[in-house]
Amino acid sequence: MKMIKVKVIGRNIEKEIEWREGMKVRDILRAVGFNTESAIAKVNGKVVLEDDEVKDGDFVEVIPVVSGG
């Protein structure tokens, strides 16, 4: 089984998600309860866009966005 490791920064969430062909960053965000407006992602240490594809074995860090006034 091919997997992607995911860690949500600032929360105690670390999990592995099964990788699928054509999987994108937005799919990973949704899998851990975020959308593209509520978090940004780094793949293997680089900030990425929601439409970027992820590969088997990638390490994804999800960084929740804090906003307000």
Swiss-Prot record:
Keyword Signal: no
Post-translational modification remark: The C-terminal glycine is likely acyl-adenylated (-COAMP) by UbaA, and also probably thiocarboxylated (-COSH) to function in sulfur transfer.
Keywords: Isopeptide bond, Nucleotide-binding, Phosphoprotein, Ubl conjugation, Ubl conjugation pathway
Pfam families referenced in this protein's UniProt entry, alphabetically: ThiS
Name used for this protein in its record: Small archaeal modifier protein 2
Species name: Pyrococcus furiosus (strain ATCC 43587 / DSM 3638 / JCM 8422 / Vc1)
Entry-annotated residues carrying Glycyl adenylate: G69
Entry-linked NCBIfam families: PRK08364.1 (NF006231)
Cross-link (Glycyl lysine isopeptide (Lys-Gly) (interchain with G-Cter in SAMP2)): K55
GO molecular function, one term: nucleotide binding
Classification via InterPro entries: Beta-grasp_dom_sf, Mopterin_synth/thiamin_S_b, ThiS/MoaD-like
Gene: samp2
Modified residues (1-thioglycine): G69
Domain of life of the source: Archaea
UniProt function note: Functions as a protein modifier covalently attached to lysine residues of substrate proteins, as well as a sulfur carrier in tRNA thiolation. The protein modification process is termed sampylation and involves the formation of an isopeptide bond between the SAMP2 C-terminal glycine carboxylate and the epsilon-amino group of lysine residues on target proteins. Is able to form polymeric chains with itself likely at Lys-55, similar to ubiquitin and other ubiquitin-like proteins. May serve as a proteolytic signal in the cell to target proteins for degradation by proteasomes.
Lineage of the organism: Archaea, Methanobacteriati, Methanobacteriota, Thermococci, Thermococcales
Cross-link (Glycyl lysine isopeptide (Gly-Lys) (interchain with K-? in acceptor proteins)): G69
